[in-house]
Structures are given as C-alpha cells and as structure tokens.
Amino acid sequence: MFLPTTREEMRKLGWKELDIILVTGDAYVDHPSFGVAFIGHYLVSHGFKVGIIAQPDWRTEKDITRLGRPRLFFGVTAGNVDSMVANYTASKKKRKTDDYTPGGIGGKRPDRATIVYTNLIKRFFPEVPVVLGGLEASLRRFAHYDWWSDRVRKSVLVDSKADLLVYGMGEKAVLGIAQILSRTGDIEKCKSIRGVVWWASQKPEEGIELPSYDEISENPEKYAEALKLQTWYTDPYKNIPIYQRQDTRYVVQNPPQPPLSQEELDRLYLLPFEREVHPFYAKMGKVKAIETVKFSITAVRGCFGNCSFCALTQHQTTHVSYRSKDSILEEVRILTKKKDFKGTITDVGGPTANLYGSGCSIRETKGQCQKFCLYPIVCKVVRPNHDEFISLLESIRQIPGVRNVFVSSGIRHDFVFAEKDPDVFIRELVKYTPGQLKLAPEHAHPKVLSLMRKPPVELFLEFKKRFETLAKKMGKRKYVIGYFIVGHPGEGWRENNYLRDFILKHLGYFPQQIQIFTPTPGTVSTAMYYSGVDPFTGEKVHVERSLKVRNKMKENVLFKKKGREKR
C-alpha cells in the first residue's frame, strides 16, 4: 500500500485527517531502503494515519499545506543522505543530478533541507510540533563541524527550532512520540523517550557533558574530545545521557533505543511495501536510487567495523541485528511475484554483509568496550558466523523463480580471516559474486589505514589472490576490485604516491572507484580533519585542506598524468 501524498488519496483510504505528516528531501519511494516509507508503514501498522510530502517546493506554501494540518506532528528528514552531500561534489561544486529525484534532476531539495523544511512548517503551522529524523539530523544533533561553510554549527535542533530530534534508527522512538502525543498532546512528556534529543534551559543533573559549542568553536581539539566521548558513550547498554551547552541552553541526548530484536526486525521488513516509486512522483521521471536496491535484501543492521569515515556506524551503531532466515525467504518470495522481477536478487547484506549471524558477548551485555572490534586485528571475543550467511544464500537460491543470488559489496575481508579456514567461505562467495566483487581497502599506506581504522592492505591482496585463484579453479571468470579514498586525514603526497605505486604494482588495472574524502558531520574522520588530531590517540595528523591539491591527488591515482607527483 502506498501512503497518501494528496487529499484525493486520503479520501480513497477513507481518511479525513492525518495523524502524522512526514516530509522528505527524496522522492517518495515505497521501499524499505527509504527511511520515510519505513517509518510511515511502521506507524500505520500501529494504527496511525500517515501521509508523505516529498521534495516540497520550499519557496511557497503550495506543497507543505496540501495534506492539511496533522493531528499530532510533522516528521522532517532531509532524505537518505545529507542534503549538502546530495547537492555538492567533493570539490564543492553544485551537482547537476540527484539519484533520489524523479528524472535525476538536481536542485529539487534545498541546502540544509532539515532546517529549511522545519522553518517552512513553522511558518504555516506554528502550533504543530516538528520532530526531526534521518541521517542529516542524526549526525548533526550536537554542535558539529560543517565543511561547506568551514565553521562549527550548532545542533540542527537549535538551528531549525524544531521541537524534538530522533537519532539513529528511529522506529521505536517515533512510535513512542506518536503514542504519547495521541494520549496527552504534551510534547514535554516525550522528552523521556530513549533515542530522543531535546533542549533544556537548565544543566541536566546527570550524564556526560561534552565540550560546549563555544569551546569547540574556539579550540578544534575540543571537538575531537567531544567526538570521542560521544562515540564511546552513545550506547544503549551504558544507559548514559549526553549533553552539551550551546549559548544559554543545553542540548540533551537521551540514551539510545536498544537494538531491535530479531522478531521486531522481521516484522518491519515484511510490512506491505509496494517497492515502487509512488505514481505521483513516477510520472515525473525515473528515480535512479531505487534501481540498485529494488530487488536487494537487507539482512543486517548495524556495523562494528568502526571505519573512521563512515556515517553508518555513527547512525546505526556498532550493535548488529540480523533477520531470521524465514523472514528473508518470505521477502524473497514477495519479490519473485513482482512483474519486473527477472530472477536475480541483486544483493543480500547491509552495511557489512558478512556480519550476518556474528556477535560479541561483551557488547551484547555491557555495551561497546573501549577497543575496536576489527582494528588493529579482529578481537578474539567477536564471533564470526560465515556458515550461517552461506546457508542463507543457498536457501534463497532454492526459491522457485530465483535464478541468481548475489552479494555485490559489503564484505569485510579481514573478518573472513577470523575463520579457521577462510577458503571455505571464499569458495562459496565465488558462487554468489556477479562477475566482480567490490571490496573497500580504501588505501594502501599503513599510516593512512591506521587513521581510517582499516586493516593492512596485505590482507586485501591475500583475499584477492585466494578469491581469484579459487574462481579460476571453479572455471569462473570473477574478480575483486577495490574502492579507494584520497585526501583523507594523514595523506600527503608521499602517501598518495604510495597508493599510486601500489595500484600500479599489484592491481593490474586503473581503478575508477576512487573518491575524494568529504568531511561529513558526525564522523571520526571529520573530527580529524577539523582538529588535526586523532580523537582516540591525541596524535597530530596531517590534513590536506586545499581543494586543488585534493583533486590533483585523485588525478594522480587515476593515472591521468604520466609519472608520480613530486612533493
């Protein structure tokens, strides 16, 4: 079932009024990979009437008022990605296209969409509460360095003047807000819900205090300290509030919601999604973002990889939840009934596919300890379970109508070597690879990899060798390709040339999967970029801030110039 986007669609459902209206910077795609559809269906399954306004024109009241006034609240998200990332390249050039917009047209969402949409709502519905959510709001919930303006900005909750902010994967927190407002109409009573950020005029009596907005604005190393505290103490099992002074007020983060149980996760993904672009938006053109996920399966939520540059660890947490085999197989059966299904499940996974079935007894009871699970080596307490993942893939392949099952990306290759015999999994993985397996070594230089919290590049080479050798023995022409990042903190010309030489010597091809590091809010790497120090060691870090040099670093690794750059 599509959620309504117009009054006419409301009438067809017999709804005279909506309880909740969700506003998003993406086109409305009714698929579980799109946050608004996910939250919307979850709320409807609990008896609430929910409508969606996607990519409203923020210059007029026409779109934002078309569904009327909601009974409970507006929910606002910039979309699946930060609006500044959606609108600008790593060279700060305005993007001309947008994969989340019909027809791929750029410019359909405003910069800092969360703030703009909230201001629009407050202008025409000043008495209706506004609740922020999604990746942009979640990673900007405290004072944060904003690369596009090159300054520290206040919490998006303060800047937008919204009423509440839900961080992380927000199903249960949003449901709690809806239930309390439905019973009492009192937004103040929602401030006790886990997974919620709110502001207070008085200093909280308990919790961890982060360096203030003024402190981190004046002293970048205080920002690194704040990020470290936020990373270690944002954990459902530690149950500790975190707060930060911003001017005369305090931004308060309640402890996060606990990870969803397997039963809860199973129910979520089997809600009645259409898995299509809503007709209202489909008539405007194709939405490219659905093409890569339409026939994919999310099996895992969360990741304990702790890559410094990754926003998903900060958003989905290090606690891994995974769906039952029965739930996943049922979703596959649903996909096989789609008219345009051609027999291929394009991907099975999540942030890291081969964490399916894995766990850690310490993290599951006491929370994240002050060590990294996979860096510098895989912790002995972590339990790999690649057999269960392979069993899942084999079961999917047996379903009538399924000809191919692929794992296209999201494999943490160092985790495979935690098994007694890595070749057992690698051999099976060959069967489920669509020609090329995309891995993410990210760099080659030991210093840069250390700052990224990534394994030594030798493990990537060993995995690549074993995979391609086994594929050849099996009569398969399948290969491993790598993703790389340039311009990350710690990389100068020496490290960049090291990466170039590594590619030339070991890969045998010129990779196109190279991106320039973008300092996005809320990540450890961004804290390094702004502060010039590693938040966890306090060591000084070289940071290349020149856009011109960063672009040249990419050209150097892409072999667009003959010879190495001399610096």
Curated annotation (Swiss-Prot):
InterPro entries: Elp3/MiaA/NifB-like_rSAM, rSAM, rSAM_horseshoe, UPF0313, UPF0313_C, UPF0313_N. Its cofactor is [4Fe-4S] cluster. It comes from the Bacteria. Binds 1 [4Fe-4S] cluster. The cluster is coordinated with 3 cysteines and an exchangeable S-adenosyl-L-methionine. Keywords: 4Fe-4S, Iron, Iron-sulfur, Metal-binding, S-adenosyl-L-methionine. Residues 288-560 form the Radical SAM core domain. [4Fe-4S] cluster binds at C303, C307, C310. GO terms for molecular function: 4 iron, 4 sulfur cluster binding; catalytic activity; iron ion binding. Coiled coil: none annotated. HAMAP family: UPF0313. NCBIfam families: SAM_YgiQ. Belongs to the UPF0313 family. This is UPF0313 protein TM_0337.
